[in-house]
Amino acid sequence: MTQFEIECLDSKVYNARDHWSRFVIDPLKPGQGTTLGNALRRTLLSELEGLAITAVRIAGVSHEFSTINGIREDVLEILLNLKEIVFSGQLQESTIGRLTVQGPAIVTARSFELPPEIKLIDPEQYIATICGNNTLEMEFKIEVGSGYKIVEKDNSTEHFEFLQVDSVFMPVKKVNFRIEETRGENNILNEQLILDIWTNGSISAKEAISNAADNLINLFSPLKTIDGESETDYETNETSHINQILIEELQLSVRAYNCLKRGCAHIHSVADLLDYSQEDLIEIKNFGQKSAEEVIDALQKRLGINLPKEKTTKIYNK
């Protein structure tokens, strides 16, 4: 079977938050272009992770319909401007950013105080204008997610203090594709998939396709293990079978999967994971508590395996 190839035909950077690339994937058999195009488009738009502001606390403000003395924009306009801010970086759990500016001044994202692991894509993004000797002071939550998150009512004390923001996590803004017929060797009819991808600058289109492919591989990998073994045969070979299971079958998030398989740990199977305790997982470089809990939960629910809690004598590359 001829393996298809992907090539970047063209790319442009219109501004810091508007990148475009065009790819061609070929040769494909008739019908494969639509199958591949639909799967990639859906995954690129809805499943890739990104960072976004999800909540804001502004000094002296109790609700989103307030105005701030000496600030040209009302609170709702400021929230809409914050919603458009684009970040990049690796984040395991929510974090806090801050802004304090004394007027008169035009406030942009450049004035943000951010954790070192988070980067601004466009420091010139506009926030507000301060008139006179007034101060704009706020702090905001940054979270990792995918797709679009609509504000949900939350009466907890923490959420009461923060103004919630509809958040756009999607690093890919738009995807178009079309199918063209081509002729291969011996005049055989083939297809080629032309794929146009627009990103917000937090990742490149090439990275987006790679991440989408990882997601699709994780989705379909469990289908490879279907077999006709009887219940007796399965029970006899249960331990051996579990040890041979690849980590793809745990259906982990792309972040956790990449840290295990492509990071310094080089974990490829459940057998490899059994060498680790719960404390060992947390100490894997760039892994973190959230990813460790995801792996522990997947092993327990899918395979009935409970990792020991105590740390082993394993040596880690940090």
Curated annotation (Swiss-Prot):
SUPFAM superfamilies noted in UniProt: C-terminal domain of RNA polymerase alpha subunit, Insert subdomain of RNA polymerase alpha subunit, RBP11-like subunits of RNA polymerase
GO cellular component, one term: DNA-directed RNA polymerase complex
EC category: transferase
Chain positions covered by the region annotation Alpha C-terminal domain (alpha-CTD): 241-318
SMART domains, alphabetized: RPOLD (SM00662)
EC annotation from Swiss-Prot or TrEMBL: 2.7.7.6
Annotated keywords: Chloroplast, DNA-directed RNA polymerase, Nucleotidyltransferase, Plastid, Transcription, Transferase
Annotated InterPro entries: DNA-dir_RNA_pol_insert, DNA-dir_RNA_pol_RpoA/D/Rpb3, DNA-dir_RpoA, RBP11-like, RNAP_asu_C, RNApol_insert_sf
Source domain of life: Eukaryota
Role summary: DNA-dependent RNA polymerase catalyzes the transcription of DNA into RNA using the four ribonucleoside triphosphates as substrates.
Quaternary state and interactors: In plastids the minimal PEP RNA polymerase catalytic core is composed of four subunits: alpha, beta, beta', and beta''. When a (nuclear-encoded) sigma factor is associated with the core the holoenzyme is formed, which can initiate transcription.
Family indicated by similarity: Belongs to the RNA polymerase alpha chain family.
Protein name: DNA-directed RNA polymerase subunit alpha
